[in-house]
């Protein structure tokens, strides 16, 4: 006789954070016939068909994926706090330009990812740095961590608890090229290097 079964993943009611479950169904057809050489024996053949994709396969395969983001519930983005000091006269809003750039570990020039001006109180408000592990994770403007590793300004390593840790290196500097500073102002050529540590605790 012929017997058919449906196989699908049992998705838990409380889903694991960051996990995307495989929702497809595979139909299994079992055909049982008598052995032509030994009538007392039965022989079974099995075929599989992915109902969702309409594709015949040699087995039932289910593939889940995991991704995480600082934009997911419980995640935190990196706030970058910078302040400009001008000696000799009051500071005006928008007088000075500042750049936030990646800092590759090989010493090569990084890529400028943000440009901001000072406020009247001297604060420079860079946008928060947000991160995710894949394109499908939350956060349209988040930096993809695997790409940061390939670009050379991030390193990936495990911590003592087995969590994945990314260490990203950045530099903030003031635009002090000729013609970019107000009259009578001379720059103290300074840049500030900092790192951001992102820990993926396995919960998205």
Where are these regions (language model features)?
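Solvent-exposed loop/turn and edge beta-strand elements of beta-rich ligand-binding domains
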Residues: 1-204
């Amino acid at each position: 006789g012929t017997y058919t079964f449906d196989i699908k993943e049992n998705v838990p009611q409380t889903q694991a954070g960051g996990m995307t479950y495989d929702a497809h169904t595979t139909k299994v057809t079992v055909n049982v016939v008598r052995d032509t050489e030994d009538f007392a024996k039965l022989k079974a053949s099995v075929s599989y068909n992915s109902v969702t994709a309409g594709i015949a396969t040699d087995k039932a395969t289910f593939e889940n994926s995991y991704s995480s983001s600082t934009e997911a519930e419980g995640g935190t983005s990196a706030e970058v706090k910078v302040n400009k000091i001008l000696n000799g006269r009051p500071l005006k809003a928008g007088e000075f330009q500042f750049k936030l750039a990646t800092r590759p570990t090989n010493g090569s020039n990084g890529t400028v990812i943000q440009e901001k001006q000072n406020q009247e109180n001297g604060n420079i408000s860079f946008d928060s740095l947000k991160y995710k592990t894949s394109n499908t994770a939350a956060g349209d403007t988040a930096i993809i961590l695997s790409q940061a590793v390939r670009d050379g300004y991030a390193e990936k390593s495990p911590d003592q608890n087995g969590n994945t840790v990314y260490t990203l290196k950045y530099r903030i500097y003031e635009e002090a090229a000729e013609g970019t500073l107000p009259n009578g102002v001379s720059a103290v050529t300074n840049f500030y290097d900092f790192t951001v540590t992102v820990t993926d605790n396995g919960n998205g």
